[in-house]
């Protein structure tokens, strides 16, 4: 490495660290490289939707979601010794909501930008392009259709390229032929398992970012007329009127102490919005909330005995249940639940007991009379009651259901997705298969290096439904079959 290249690399990394905060840029510790997260600015009222003929697509089709934020594009890069004088940075570009074909188009444009900047540093130009021009370059408009690319197909392509490179050398004729046939760049990674998980991740990320933005803004409370940060405020879900938590706390406490539990409306005159039980619970003391909950339930039952509340924390709207039945369907979120246990409706099967309620159920059963015991056995099932009596506590849960981060030891549970994991404690990347730490500059090299024990196992042991893949991938398979003929 020449002194000029080393100085240019150090200056560029230092400049990026000063321009972007820690959430957007992180320098690798062991190599000249790092990771950038590109958060795109979306137009107002940007909508996403799903369509298709697979079972998973049909379950989500017909719904449009208005969002303000999308998960970031992640650019992992490593600077070679002769950068920027001769060679470009090696990189991978990953994203959850762009298909492999779209990510490949971005990778190709990054290559073109390097050609334009050859001999000069290019990382800032790459980041600016991804942040400001991605939507325009890919012709993405609202409503935007979410798509999935075939990870199995991508893995087969990576295997073919690796074998071709091994036989003829990197850049050989066979490798060049493979590159010409493929439309998906091996540097493009759509790190999401399925459309259903993709939609949920987008909605969760959008809610988290909206909360973060709300908490960082200043709002004028219409009660005390003081400006306060959003983290010290709360807004009513229906009308979006904002008040400071201190004023709402006093307002709620006075109403609850007076028994006016149905009068927790928005303080704005003539506004019909009502605080949710979750909002009330957040502000008032536990004993006062217990009084509120009891009075609210009692007043509701006095007026209409067949009304229950949706158990979802984000909804909690009143729901009518059918006479003589135990099933109720929320008209707002369409959640079907059992009116006894407040969990997903389970038909004639006994109510399930969560781990948190096992101890309470055991104590209640031991202190109950014979009639109450028979009722509990009928509601939860005798087997569940017996299990609650036998189990004193849920020990060894972490050992059976989680693995420890190789860096900080934080217990991590894998729900779904690929085998490239991120520790929620120290943000270290690691492999779920071998539990080895991964490079921040290029965490996917562990799965693409033919010498690695986890080569081509990014989605190992993940149940992937082949019906969800794009028609363009199926057409590629048909073309390959025709070529074989």
Curated annotation (Swiss-Prot):
One of its GO terms (cellular component) is cytosolic ribosome. Residues 11-137 form the RWD domain. Zn(2+) 5 binds at residues 405, 408, 423, 426. It is an enzyme of class 2 (transferase). Its main location: cytoplasm. Zn(2+) 2 binds at residues 239, 241, 266, 271. PROSITE patterns: RWD, TRIAD, ZF_RING_1, ZF_RING_2. It is found in: Cytoplasm; Nucleus. Residues 217-458 are annotated as: TRIAD supradomain. Pathway: Protein modification; protein ubiquitination. Zn(2+) 6 binds at residues 431, 434, 446, 454. Zn(2+) 4 binds at residues 338, 341, 346, 351. It catalyses: [E2 ubiquitin-conjugating enzyme]-S-ubiquitinyl-L-cysteine + [acceptor protein]-L-lysine = [E2 ubiquitin-conjugating enzyme]-L-cysteine + [acceptor protein]-N(6)-ubiquitinyl-L-lysine. Zn(2+) 1 binds at residues 221, 224, 244, 247. A motif (D-box) lies at residues 37-45. Keywords: Cytoplasm, Metal-binding, Nucleus, Phosphoprotein, Repeat, Transcription, Transcription regulation, Transferase, Ubl conjugation, Ubl conjugation pathway, Zinc, Zinc-finger. GO terms for molecular function: nuclear androgen receptor binding; ubiquitin protein ligase activity; ubiquitin-like protein transferase activity; zinc ion binding. It comes from the Eukaryota. The keyword Protease does not apply. Belongs to the RBR family. RNF14 subfamily. The N-terminal destruction box (D-box) acts as a recognition signal for degradation via the ubiquitin-proteasome pathway. Interacts with GCN1; interaction takes place in response to ribosome collisions and is required for ubiquitination of EEF1A1/eEF1A. Interacts with the ubiquitin-conjugating enzymes UBE2E1 and UBE2E2. Interacts with AR/androgen receptor. Interacts with TCF7/TCF1, TCF7L1/TCF3 and TCF7L2/TCF4; promoting Wnt signaling. This is E3 ubiquitin-protein ligase RNF14. The gene is Rnf14.
